[in-house]
Amino acid sequence: MTAGPHRVVVLVFDGMKLLDLSGPAEVFSEANRFGADYRLSIVSADGSPVRSSIGMLVPADTDARAAAAHDTLVVVGGDALPGSPVGPVLGAAAKELAERAGRVASVCTGAFVLGAAGLLEGRRATTHWQHTATLARRCPS
């Protein structure tokens, strides 16, 4: 019996770091060159394109509610996350997508989105070294 594709949803938002999307996307693409079967889908909370931290518009394949079944959720980071609260719409989107994923991960400051969604409670997590103390204060459990 052959396993089907491993579906990965990447949650993006305005101000996200483009590297936090392109880096993991390249890793999954390289894995596919060596026989893996990863399928990437870019998701924003409402399905709208988002503007990255460098001003580039990133289209979303769909919104969080309509996202297809997936195995892994990856939440990208953004420079503003450590310094300001995560919006409730983004937090709700992360929570909804995480509830349907077998594995949840974040890149860099994306951990702040997971924390705001209550997804770090009782778990160990890390973020960019400059923001570990802030993450620990915001997500003490």
Curated annotation (Swiss-Prot):
Which GO BP terms sit in this record?
Answer: regulation of DNA-templated transcription
Write down the InterPro entries for this protein, in alphabetical order.
Class_I_gatase-like, DJ-1/PfpI, INH-QAR
- Give all cystine bridges in this chain: none
Highest taxon in the source lineage: Bacteria
Against Pfam families, the record matches this protein to: DJ-1_PfpI (PF01965)
Give the UniProt family note.
Belongs to the peptidase C56 family.
Q: Which PANTHER family match?
A: ARAC-FAMILY TRANSCRIPTIONAL REGULATOR, HTH-TYPE TRANSCRIPTIONAL REGULATOR RV1931C
Quote the protein name from its UniProt record.
Uncharacterized protein in cpoL 5'region
Q: Which organism is it from?
A: Streptomyces lividans
